Amino acid sequence: MSSPDARDARSPSPRPRSPSPAAPSRSWSRSRHESPSRSPAPMRERREEEGNEQRSPRQIAHHPRSPRGSDRRAEPRRRDAGGGGGDKYRPAKARKQRSPPPAATEEQKQAAAKAEYERLLTARSGGTYVPPARLRALQAQITDKTSMAYQRMAWDALKKSINGLINKVNVSNIKPLVPELFNENLVRGRGLFCQSAIKAQAASLPFTPIYAALVAVVNTKLPQVGELLLRRLVLRFRKAFRRNDKAVCLSATTFVAHLVNQQVAHEMVAGQMLLLLLNKPTDDSVEIAVGLTREVGQFLEEMNAAIANVVFDRFRDILHEADIAKRTQYMIEVLFQTRKDRFKDNPAIRDELDLVEEDDQIKHFVELDGELDAQDGLNIFKFDPEYEENEEKYKKLKAEILGEGSDYEDDSDDEGSDSSDDEPAAAEQKAMDIQDRSNADLVALRRTIYLTLMSSMDPEEAVHKLMKINLPQGLEGELPSLVVESCAQERTYSKFYGAIGERLAKINRLWTDLFEKSFEHYYTSIHRYETNRLRNIARFFGHMFSSDAIGWHCLSVIHLNEEETTSASRIFIKILFQEISEAMGMPKLHTRTKDAALQPYMEGLFPRDTARNIRFSINYFTSIGMGVLTEDSREFLQNMPKPALPAPPPDSDSESSSSYSSYTGSSYSRSRSPSPRRRSYSRSRSRSVTPRRTNSNGRNNARSPSRSVSRSISRSRSPAPIRGRSYSRSVSRSRSRSYSRSVSRSPTPPRRQAPAQQRGRQRSYTPSDRSRSRSYSRSRSPRGRSYTRSPDRAGPQASTAPRSGGPPRKAGSVDNRSPLSRSPSGSRSPSPRRRRDSPSRSPVRDRESGGRAAAAAPGNSEARRGRSYSRSPSRTRSPSPAPSRRRRRDSSSDASAPRKRRRESSR
């Protein structure tokens, strides 16, 4: 039975009765067959619904319900309006309201979040898709680090991060990506790292060198990671080799080869793989071995040539004996050609991937057939009871690897954290910049310039290509230097390089200055080059000077003198000026050297400082056929003032004046100042009366050697400044020209000749004046000569050789004229001891020079050629040295005097 409330709720409010006659019967039938508790409203609604089903939707849309019916359903009429739901029979009961659910605690929320997270991760389908916002919300609710859910969440984040970093590594970003990789816990995730690296390498073999370089960097700090990766690769190779899986074998061997190149794996690992592959050769195994050898061959040749030789010998045997396909044979032949080319297309390590110093690398050796543990359990998540302690340990290790101030924020999605991370990353990148001191950039630049020069057909093309080369700042001087060096290495000079230098210098002032500096550099270091290179360099710069590509003021670095030049520099100057004269012509070159604006820069080539340097320059240019350039120097040398006379020495008691000679020294009579070449002191007196005709056997006993300083006193009564000449065939060693002045007091007869009846003939001329005077001679003796037709009869002592024992020299009778001798004849001294009929009135030799002629000893030694002029015969009383040997002298014998310095005075 339904309650009255239910009936009221289902039945609408009563309607007024219909006036139609059928209404009572319809009402009676309902009341007759139905329970009185049911309301007729449901029947009407059912009929209306059946009618609506028969009608179309459009008809339903345009068939509005009766507003009276809707009003009845919306607001049913109740008897008790204040009761809230009753009918006219019973009042409505009070409604029960539900109590709110109790608030969940924090523990309950954590538990619910963990349960939901576990349900999502452990679902049978592998985990349903969870929107990122909901996943982050779930993760944010899990904050307990000791819980498995939190560690599982951190493990998933670590896996995604390592996998993402390995997948995006390339040559350009490998350096900044290394710190990001170390920011992840690679000790906990070393299995994930190895797994991701192997998968990424197998998917893209051309990127194997990049992955190997990344592993090499990690291996320097975490060697256990590199060792684990090597063990897994070896196990992967062994499994694939047994299964005949060529693709896996190829990827594993390629990765191992590049790890060997990076010195992560020992070269014996690659050697074992090669020997295993070539033990029973098949087409696939030989192909894999060829690929492995191509990658690791250069490293084996350099580090362990024995392994390389064994492997290539095995390849040679396979090529000749094994039954393999033509394609495989061709691969082996190509491999041998690659080895012949020194693996130039397969370098061991590319320059941009050489990130680790050789000393920092750690090698791992793994036996190919040994017991290896892949540690596959590191690939899956495991709960760590000491999670926080292990994380703190890795943070300390990370600080040691990256530095104290290089920690990275975990939240990479936050823009603020990203901007704050940029500064430490930039600092770390700056700290990791490697200073390349191997000059690799310089070598590459010089190679580029050289190849550009060699590949050009003409100078215009070469200059056009050279101008396109991007020269780093500070290395602009390499271009002129390499042009000169390329020119120098040619067998003969090529105008190709001269034209290049000329065009470069005329394009920009920068190149002009650089070529001028190059000229100075090469001139100062020209002695380091061989003759052929020196010639090419000189001709190159000769072309530059002749074409006015560089300024002539550069010639100021040349100082043409004996002290500052070498044989190489003199050859360089010669070839330089010959090239300039051939290009310009001698008249233009002469005009250029006489240019007034260039004279300050030509002082080194044509010096004006000393006579010696001027003569050196004149002789140099004359010897190379360019004497016309030295006309001004010759004129300057002729008009060059002579230097002042040197002051007499303070210990000289000479009464006569001394004169200057530019080539030889001076001798002073009555002085103790020595002459420049040979020095001795002697004093001789001569007293002779010269008759009008005398036959005398003159004896000259002189002990003074050549260049002696003599003191002689002659007395005559009449001064007779008349020139006289004495000729003697015995030439003394003292080459002196003596000038003497004397006043004679004795009468001097006129000159007279008589045949000499002595062994030595003398001929002298004395004036006819009679004078008596005491004279002091002043002698200047550069190269005096005395000529006699026979030597003096100086007794047995004079006919002996001097003490010096010098070898005799051939005499030459040269007629050399000397200045006047103004010593008067007719002295008071007696005549010589031996007299013969002599055609001369004065058998005297060079009395004024201290008995130099008297010191002439027989022999063939060359004596100093001198002329003496005297007007009276004299006999010197200075004793001659003791004879060392006697020798018969003829009419053309020469006298030699000892070179030893002796001072001896005898009166």
Curated annotation (Swiss-Prot):
Q: Where is the composition biased (Acidic residues)?
A: 406-425
GO annotations of cellular component type: catalytic step 2 spliceosome; cytoplasm
Biased composition of type Pro residues is found at 13-22
Name the SMART domains on file: MA3 (SM00544), MIF4G (SM00543)
Instruction: Give the InterPro entries listed for this entry.
Output: ARM-type_fold (IPR016024), CWC22_splicing_factor (IPR050781), Initiation_fac_eIF4g_MI (IPR003891), MIF4G-like_typ-3 (IPR003890)
* GO BP annotations listed: mRNA splicing, via spliceosome
Where does this polypeptide localize?
Cytoplasm; Nucleus
Report biased composition (Basic and acidic residues) as residue ranges.
1-10, 43-56, 68-81, 837-850
Composition bias (Basic residues) maps to: 675-686, 773-783, 898-907
A GO molecular function assigned to this protein is: RNA binding
Name all MI domain ranges.
444-560
- Superkingdom of the organism of origin: Eukaryota
Question: Which residue ranges have biased composition labelled Low complexity?
Answer: 655-674, 687-731, 753-772, 817-830, 869-879
Q: Which residues form the MIF4G domain?
A: 159-342
Residue ranges annotated as transmembrane are none
Annotated region described as Disordered, given as residue ranges = 1-114, 405-433, 639-907
Which UniProt keywords are present, listed alphabetically? Cytoplasm, mRNA processing, mRNA splicing, Nucleus, Spliceosome
Q: Quaternary state and partners of this protein?
A: Associated with the spliceosome.
Q: What does this protein do?
A: Involved in pre-mRNA splicing.
Similarity comment text for this entry? Belongs to the CWC22 family.
Name under which the protein is recorded: Pre-mRNA-splicing factor CWC22
Query: What gene name is listed for this protein?
Result: CWC22
